[in-house]
Amino acid sequence: PLEQWMKTQEESAKILTEQFMNVTTIGGLIINLLLMALLPAIAEELTFRGVLQRLFEGKSLEDASLQNGSKAPYSLKARIPHLAIWCSAILFSAIHMQFYGFVPRMLMGALFGYMLVWTGSLWIPILMHFTNNAMAVLLYFVALRQGWDMEKVDAIGTNDTLWLGVVSMVITIIGIYAFRRSITMSNASSRMSN
């Protein structure tokens, strides 16, 4: 049945990830940062935010840009991008074939999509995606080198350490609010000066 297939996919992804992450040398860390942080950040953001989200918005790919100029090509007034953001976020999460983490990954994909809309720069979601993946790679690397119990490392943010997840979520929400507010104020001051 479907549930068994999902469990099998989840377990396969976990085994593959652990095989990649099971390094304790600086060279291995650098390779993992390239393969598991930098390349996915660039490739997935180009695909899901740079292409799919734009297609869902009905925009041509001709005006796609990695440059953050003073005038963003994305306008909340011109189009309502919410549907495009959420469609690309759902696909982003589904393509990872890790169903038990579907909702958090979908929310992260939506955050990346909104950051693209708010800033007009694909570099912001790429940087955020890289930072997220790099932090996981670095945590795993340090945990292995220090001999930490990997079961406890994997459980960070759940059960006994649920408070860490809550604190992280609150900090993230405050950061998003502050970032969005600064973008809005910056746009308002640029309109006033013109």
Identify the function of each model-found stretch.
Residues 30, 34, 82-87, 102-103, ...:
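Hydrophobic alpha-helical transmembrane segments
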Residues 31-56, 173-182:
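Transmembrane alpha-helical segments in integral membrane proteins
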Residues 1-6, 50, 54, 58-59, ...:
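Membrane-interface elements of multi-pass transporters and channels
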Residues 1-40, 58-73, 77-80, 189, ...:
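Juxtamembrane helix-loop-helix connectors linking adjacent transmembrane helices
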Residues 86-157:
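Functionally important transmembrane alpha-helices
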Residues 25-31, 102-104, 156-162:
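Juxtamembrane helix-entry segments on the extracytoplasmic side of multipass membrane proteins
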Residues 130-194:
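C-terminal membrane module of polytopic membrane proteins
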Residues 43-87, 114-121:
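Membrane-interface helix/loop boundary segments of multi-pass membrane proteins
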